[in-house]
Amino acid sequence: MLDIKVIRENLDWSKKKLATRGIKPEELDELVEIDTKRRKDLTMSEQLKAKRNDVSKQIAEKKRNKEDASDAIAEMREVGKEIKKLDKEVDELTEKQNYILLRLPNFPADSDPIGPDDSYNEEVRKWEEPTKFDFKPKAHWDLGTDLGILDWDRASKVSGARFVYYIGAGALLERAVFNFFLDENTKDGYTEIIPPYLVNDASMQGTGQFPKFHEDVYTIVDNDDPDKPRDLTLIPTAEVPLVNYFRNEIIHENKLPINVTAMSPAFRSEAGSAGRDTRGLIRMHEFRKVEMVKICKPDESWDELEKLTHNAEHLLQKLGLPYHVVALSTGDASFTSAKTYDLEVWMPAQDKYREISSCSNCTDFQARRAQIRYRDEDGKLHLAHTLNGSGLAVGRCVAAILENYQNEDGSVTVPDVLVPYMNGMKKITKESGLI
């Protein structure tokens, strides 16, 4: 959530910044108008409360002196009514103000490419050239099906579209990938956490998914009243429980920066994705992802973003997967992010790079919503900065391995770093199948 004081004191700058993220200037004008009225009512209420205290003392004094206090009592009643009216208005205006603030995205960093969509993203660097073959490479969904290690048809029978079964070497490869990621992340100084996969609304609001993105997630409903959702949602990313671990907490400065990592399933409705990536592992309703989260001081967050991005790059490099890093435009960056780097891995069969990680600096945007603060050496409280990044999306990594390490005979060579995680298996060949 943005700081209303920053908007109030820098209205033109705020309009210019948020215009690059699709926010109309009238929305900020309305917000500041509400804020002005709210602060005026709050000041009047505080003045009347001070007056009520004075009148209360006068009444007590008159009663001690056995004097008539009826006029003062009547005045205090009228003051009380006015206070009640003003406080109600303040509450209503606060609710309106928060309604708008909770739906405004983060201010973009000055270094962000300006543009409405991903066509304005800018390549920052590239690692290795795209994989070349002496034969026409197969798509990972064909490889997985032919090898008998991925089964979308039976998953569709059981769960519907955008679900998959991993079988035999496929399941082993998926497990090898996320165990490798977790081991590498812990070597890089991250503490591993196994978080809850169901979170409450306050947590979803803390990281910015609610109230704006209800349609993108799966919420648990009450069996006795299906129209009434319970206060529980399946996590769309481990970022939610990891960041909210620190919600309403005060961290001592000497504990920062904090680095945590987790592997979890991620559940997404993929609202608005009809017709996109209908085959394969790229866009699923349920998938596994390893997440990295950092909590740090404001003056450290930009350096920490570079470290976070390099941590994610390190994983792709050890796997030998070609990729490039792109800086997202103001119109393509996520709601909570001030700056995002996407890592996109090369997919030979698609002949293009596909996102496998997003590394974002959310500055104090999430910390303000979730009240994540730290106490400095002088005892003063400050909002922390939060960062998050995929390290990495597991299913997409499996897809990239299948496509980049495929052989002409349809087998897939296991990347060297994964062989110990695959019980020594160096090549995936056709499975006999369960049925």
UniProtKB/Swiss-Prot annotation:
Binding site for ATP: R268, S269, E270, E355, I356, S357, S358
Catalytic activity: tRNA(Ser) + L-serine + ATP = L-seryl-tRNA(Ser) + AMP + diphosphate + H(+); tRNA(Sec) + L-serine + ATP = L-seryl-tRNA(Sec) + AMP + diphosphate + H(+)
PROSITE patterns per UniProt: AA_TRNA_LIGASE_II (PS50862)
Binding site for L-serine: T237, A238, E239, E291, S390
Any GO BP: selenocysteine biosynthetic process
Main function: Catalyzes the attachment of serine to tRNA(Ser). Is also able to aminoacylate tRNA(Sec) with serine, to form the misacylated tRNA L-seryl-tRNA(Sec), which will be further converted into selenocysteinyl-tRNA(Sec).
Family membership noted in the UniProt record: Belongs to the class-II aminoacyl-tRNA synthetase family. Type-1 seryl-tRNA synthetase subfamily.
Record-given protein name: Serine--tRNA ligase
